[in-house]
Design a protein with these regions (language model features):
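Metallo-beta-lactamase
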Residues: 50, 101-102, 178, 255
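Periplasmic alpha-helical coiled-coil/stalk elements that build and connect Gram-negative outer-membrane
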Residues: 1-95, 196-199, 203, 245
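Residues on the lipid-exposed face of transmembrane beta-strands in outer-membrane beta-barrel proteins
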Residues: 61, 152-156, 255
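Hydrophobic, lipid-facing positions within transmembrane beta-strands of outer-membrane proteins
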Residues: 92, 148-154, 196
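Amphipathic alpha-helical coiled-coil segments
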Residues: 1-3, 21, 39, 57, ...
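Structural signature of outer-membrane beta-barrel channels/translocons
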Residues: 53, 122-124, 155-159, 258
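Small/polar (Gly/Ser/Thr/Ala-rich) solvent-exposed segments
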Residues: 104, 123-150, 158-169, 175
């Protein structure tokens, strides 16, 4: 993380100035100064590596979006908690089952299959048609009719060579396949949504714990720095405190990142993600 390594470098350089001052005054040995310099060199390598990874990821993202590799990216969404997760896992599952477009497609296919069954079965039923005829026998236009005929025609399919039964069987088979796909899709959506919900909840709790660890690491470094400055602690203790602080910040930002990703996965699973998502 570029921000974490940059912050760690600033802290280590400040501590190096303190160690240099104590060395010049004869309070610490040269090995302390050298250890601090080695530590800073290691942090500089970490910072350069973080910057390199960022540029590589930026180029890959540009390529995936069809932009030029050198196109600068300016993220507009900060790595902070912008919204909490509300509702229970069952609520999210119900939303997913009603919002996911895949389920809408299968429900539409189910309706079509049922209509095909009804259509094929209608071939067994009699077909009734009404006919009529109306004539006016006059040289002039008039309001009365001299002749009219009304009738009905009934057609009964006595034998179709099992054609209708086969059509019905095929339609029922299609309905069974669609309903089986619905069950499988529904189960998959439930599992996916539950997993995304639990991951988001876990990441949110990790943020809380990581924030406490950051505060503790900051306070620990302050205490250790004062003790070292007063000659009550070795350079090893100071460097360990710096590393603990750096790791605490890394864990905190990783938890924030994981929560963001989990939120996206949850919204995708529920079928509710849109361009306004943050």
């Amino acid at each position: 993380n570029i921000m974490v390594t940059k912050q760690a470098l600033e802290t280590s350089n400040a501590n190096l100035n303190m160690i240099q001052s104590r060395y010049n005054s004869g309070f610490v040995v040269k090995s302390d100064l050298l250890r601090a310099m080695v530590h800073i060199a290691d942090l500089e390598q970490q910072h350069l590596l973080a910057e390199s990874r960022f540029k590589i990821n930026e180029a890959m993202l540009n390529a995936s979006m069809g932009f030029g590799e050198a196109n600068p990216l300016n993220p507009v969404t900060p790595l902070t908690i912008r919204s909490e997760i509300h509702g229970t896992v069952d609520t999210w599952i119900d939303t997913a089952l009603s919002k996911r477009p895949e389920m809408d497609t299968l429900r539409l296919e189910e309706g079509i299959a049922k209509k095909e069954i009804a259509k094929s079965q209608s071939g067994h039923y009699p077909d009734v048609s009404l006919i009529g005829n109306y004539e006016i026998n006059s040289e002039d236009f008039g309001d009365s009719a001299d002749n009219y005929t009304l009738g009905a025609v009934v057609r009964v399919n006595i034998f179709s060579g099992n054609r209708i039964s086969e059509e019905t069987k095929a339609a029922k088979s299609m309905l069974a396949r669609v309903q089986e796909m619905q069950k499988s899709m529904e189960l998959g959506i439930k599992v996916q949504t539950r997993e995304a919900f639990l991951k988001a909840k876990s990441a949110r709790e990790r943020i809380r714990v990581a924030k406490i660890a950051v505060d503790q690491a900051e306070e620990g470094l302050r205490i250790v720095k004062n003790r070292y400055n007063n000659g009550l602690l070795t350079i090893v203790g100071l460097l360990d405190a710096e590393l603990a602080r750096q790791q605490a910040h890394t864990n905190y930002f990783k938890a924030l990142h994981d929560y963001k990703v989990a939120r996206v996965e949850l919204e995708l699973a529920a079928g509710t993600i849109d361009t306004d998502f943050q």
